[in-house]
A protein has these predicted regions:
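Solvent-exposed interhelical
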Residues: 40-78, 150-162
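Topogenic membrane-insertion module of multi-pass membrane proteins
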Residues: 1-46, 93-98, 103-138, 150-162
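Short juxtamembrane and helix-loop transition motifs at transmembrane-helix boundaries
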Residues: 1, 52-66, 79-86, 101-110
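C-terminal halves and exits of single transmembrane alpha-helices
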Residues: 73-93
């Protein structure tokens, strides 16, 4: 139940975005599904990394509902799916770089070393396959979900510190 409560928001928000675009623009775009899938996966990665970074503090307060090993497995699985989707979607380096920079601020110590090599193949593939032609759906939906996740994380940390 805690997994659904904690990680259900990105999926619901992406479905809401897809529904809104579908009704506003007719059938939407084939790129919309790719953009939303990337958005959801990046959103999960950000949330999982935040949970891993705060695990010790949560455990000390008795609020760690999930074991750390499960969180690490979830993170590796999400990054693997993201890498595969990057191969399929020919995601752009401009999309991946801000995510890596953002994750650097959220992740602590040794877990930062786990993240970097997992993102490197996606970055290399994006450089090779990308023609650097901007895609509207990728550059609109992904930042919306990433910004919403960062806002939620900031509020969560402020609430915990009070």
């Amino acid at each position: 139940m805690i997994l659904i409560k904690r990680y259900g928001f990105p999926l619901l928000l992406s479905l809401a975005l897809y529904t809104a675009v579908y009704f506003l623009f007719g059938n939407g775009s084939p790129y919309l599904g790719i953009a939303l899938a990337l958005s959801v996966i990046l959103s999960y990665v950000i949330r999982i990394c935040d949970d891993i970074g705060d695990y010790e503090k949560d455990r000390a307060q008795g609020q760690a509902p999930i074991r750390k090993s499960i969180l690490v497995v979830m993170m590796v699985a999400a990054l693997s799916v993201f890498g595969i989707l990057t191969l399929v979607a020919k995601a752009y380096i401009m999309l991946i770089s801000p995510t890596v920079i953002l994750l650097q601020f959220l992740i602590k110590d040794k877990y930062r070393d786990i993240i970097k090599p997992l993102f490197l193949p996606a970055i290399v593939v994006a450089l090779v396959l990308s023609f650097f032609t901007p895609n509207f759906w990728l550059f609109v939906t992904v930042p919306i979900l990433i910004i919403s996740d960062v806002i939620l994380i900031v509020f969560k940390r402020r609430r915990r510190d009070l």
